[in-house]
Amino acid sequence: NGCYKDSGDRLIEELENLLNQNIQIKKVTLIGHSYGGILVTHLLNNWKNTVTLDAHIIASPLQGNTSLNTLCGYKPEVNLKPMANLFEWRTQQDLDSAFKDLPKNPQNIAISGSFVTVLPDTYKGHRLGHNWSISWVADQLKKP
């Protein structure tokens, strides 16, 4: 139906199967960009495994919107479990083509325990907007 729950539940199931078959895995790292961040927050809210989960959410409208909230039952809340770490990478609203015309920044949400980074204006000579945000974060994550 285009909503995130079925895909999110499938992702949880597949990760659980992978972890059950590979007990040596001690940490899972997920990256969700834009609406992929909604999927990752669903996983965060429903994670029951004891394996550490690092979730990186990039330029994601975690406040939701009318259709997401109404049609899909999305609630803009994330409850981090002790074994989960959330890293929010937020674009500047006026530079993000997906968010710049909205009355308020849909990335702004208070999540207890989350680490928030607001991205700079530019990346390698480009306006650091919605799409370039993935590359910028990837560069940050590969730093030692």
Where are these predicted regions, by residue range?
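Active-site catalytic motif of lipid deacylating hydrolases and related acyltransferases
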Residues: 1-26
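A general structural motif
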Residues: 24-27, 50-52, 83
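Structural recognition of the beta-strand scaffold that forms the well-ordered cores
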Residues: 29-31, 54-58, 86-90
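Active-site signature of alpha/beta-hydrolase-fold catalytic machinery across serine-
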Residues: 42-46
